[in-house]
């Protein structure tokens, strides 16, 4: 594509976009530059891409997008916001793929991964080819691709959408993080349905206040647009029980569909019964009432199912079809996932890494636990420190046997992170500390007896642990299974 044509995606810039320059690819990482690359300088939190402009030129960059003045031998086109420019250029370069896809964006503190998987499965079982982008991976049809962030950078995102189209995908479902919204990674993406799950404390190391965090989430709904095309209306699916839904509704001109348990909603649940094997409830919808029996456990699972069914309805999938799918799904990896190696007590691995999600899971366990509740819990390093004492207090308040341990300490001292947690439980003697996560899991398993429940919280599906600069193999589910088998004399 000619540079002059590509720059049509940016309404205002300074510099000369030559019609003679051919652009073969776009990159923001100088290590990926090849001859014919348009290099975009991003001034990031850790690295400033402007410092690598010379290197990009040496590797074959034919032009550069920048915010700061550069002295290089190729044309430089200056923009006000490189991140926004990159997203718009990526969309244009890859042929505006989301205009040809049905695109669902799901945001919120908790539930994004489960709901995205539920919706993707519902759409797939309705006969459509699907794509999925989220915390665990990117998925194009049946092909699984690794991902580094919940929401990839805009170049990767638009390339993925393009590849989805080429593979015959008609509907893409994606998790949209608050970081991605603030950083402009999803600019240029044409959403058909946007879903708001909930808002509770997380990422305040980045957003600083809950007000900023809520504003970040609302950006998805502002981006949803105001198309009133009856054949393809824009729809916002909102949690009626979360007060921040008012903000999301105010931010969009799209049609509104609501779900909830406490407040009146278009899709609501009542007569909820929770057991150690699943949940049952009565579902009220705009097209009738239904009795549901799902294999997922807890009120939070009911919310997730309500959101998935409401979203499917927004996609014009019959409610009865959506119900059939959600009733058949056992759950999502690392989300209230049971580890069974022959022991006589439940061991649950869950991604709950926020105060609200940990509280929800422990309250659910309390509904069926016969005796003691062990919780293995830590907090991530280089992340929101404010939630550490809250996580510890919830563990002490709702579990009989809290075990404080490491999560992904990253560059922080694991001991210091645990000390931050302990600040939330002054005077308590109910917890123990095992800094090594493997030791903490083995301690819980060795202590547990019939009728007890173990929750291993925080990492869920993750199969690694980040300690300093090292990424080591570590999977809570594998470690729990090994510990159980050793206890039972099977290993």
UniProtKB/Swiss-Prot annotation:
Native source organism of the sequence: Listeria innocua serovar 6a (strain ATCC BAA-680 / CLIP 11262)
Binding site for UDP-N-acetyl-alpha-D-muramoyl-L-alanyl-D-glutamate: 30, 149-151, 177, 183, 185
Protein location: Cytoplasm
NCBIfam families in alphabetical order: murE, PRK00139.1-2, PRK00139.1-4
Sites of N6-carboxylysine modification: 217
Annotated binding of ATP, by residue: 108-114
Pathway stated in the Swiss-Prot or TrEMBL entry: Cell wall biogenesis; peptidoglycan biosynthesis
Gene Ontology biological-process annotations: cell division; cell wall organization; peptidoglycan biosynthetic process; regulation of cell shape
InterPro entries: Folylpolyglutamate_synth_CS, Mur-like_cat_sf, Mur_ligase_C, Mur_ligase_C_dom_sf, Mur_ligase_cen, Mur_ligase_N, MurE/MurF_N, UDP-N-AcMur-Glu-dNH2Pim_ligase
The name this protein goes by in its record: UDP-N-acetylmuramoyl-L-alanyl-D-glutamate--2,6-diaminopimelate ligase
Lineage: Bacteria, Bacillati, Bacillota, Bacilli, Bacillales
């Amino acid at each position: 594509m000619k540079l002059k044509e590509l720059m049509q995606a940016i309404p205002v810039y300074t510099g000369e976009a030559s019609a003679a320059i051919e652009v073969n690819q776009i990159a923001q990482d100088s290590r990926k530059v090849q001859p014919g690359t348009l290099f975009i300088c991003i001034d990031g939190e850790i690295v400033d891409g402007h410092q690598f402009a010379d290197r990009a030129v040496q590797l074959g960059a034919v032009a550069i997008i920048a915010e700061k003045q550069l002295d290089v031998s190729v044309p430089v086109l200056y923009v006000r916001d490189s991140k926004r420019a990159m997203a718009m250029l990526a969309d244009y370069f890859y042929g505006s793929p989301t205009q040809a896809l049905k695109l669902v964006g799901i945001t919120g503190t908790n539930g994004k991964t489960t709901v995205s998987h539920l919706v993707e499965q519902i759409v797939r079982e309705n006969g459509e080819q699907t794509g999925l982008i989220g915390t665990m991976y990117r998925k194009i049809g049946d092909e699984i691709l690794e991902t580094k962030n919940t929401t990839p950078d805009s170049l990767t995102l638009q390339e993925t959408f393009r590849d989805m189209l080429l593979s015959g995908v008609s509907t893409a479902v994606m998790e949209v993080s608050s970081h991605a919204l603030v950083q402009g990674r999803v600019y240029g993406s044409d959403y058909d349905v946007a879903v708001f799950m909930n808002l509770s404390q997380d990422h305040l190391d980045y957003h600083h206040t809950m007000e900023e965090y809520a504003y970040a989430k609302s950006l998805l709904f502002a981006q949803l647009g105001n198309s009133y095309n009856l054949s393809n209306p824009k729809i916002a699916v909102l949690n009626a029980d979360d007060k921040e839904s008012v903000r999301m509704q105010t931010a969009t001109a799209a049609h509104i569909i609501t779900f909830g348990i406490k407040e009146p909603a278009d899709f609501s649940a009542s007569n909820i019964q929770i057991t150690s094997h699943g949940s049952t409830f009565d579902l009220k919808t705009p097209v009738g009432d239904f009795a549901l029996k799902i294999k997922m456990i807890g009120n939070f699972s009911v919310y997730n199912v309500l959101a998935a069914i409401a979203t499917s309805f927004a996609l014009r999938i019959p409610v009865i079809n959506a119900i059939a799918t959600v009733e058949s799904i056992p759950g999502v990896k690392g989300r209230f996932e049971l580890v069974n190696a022959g022991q006589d007590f439940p061991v649950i691995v869950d991604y709950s890494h926020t105060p609200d999600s940990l509280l929800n899971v422990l309250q659910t366990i309390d509904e069926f636990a016969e005796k003691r509740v062990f919780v293995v819990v830590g907090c991530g390093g280089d992340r929101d420190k404010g939630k550490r004492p809250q996580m510890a207090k919830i563990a002490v308040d709702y579990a009989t046997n809290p075990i404080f341990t490491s999560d992904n300490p990253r560059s922080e001292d694991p001991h210091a992170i645990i000390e931050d947690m302990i600040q939330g439980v002054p005077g308590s003697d109910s917890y123990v500390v095992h800094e090594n996560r493997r030791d903490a899991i083995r301690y819980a398993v060795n202590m547990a007896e019939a009728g007890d429940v173990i929750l291993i919280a925080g990492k869920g599906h993750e199969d690694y642990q980040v300690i300093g600069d090292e990424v080591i193999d570590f999977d809570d589910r594998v470690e729990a299974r090994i510990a159980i088998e050793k206890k039972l004399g099977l290993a």
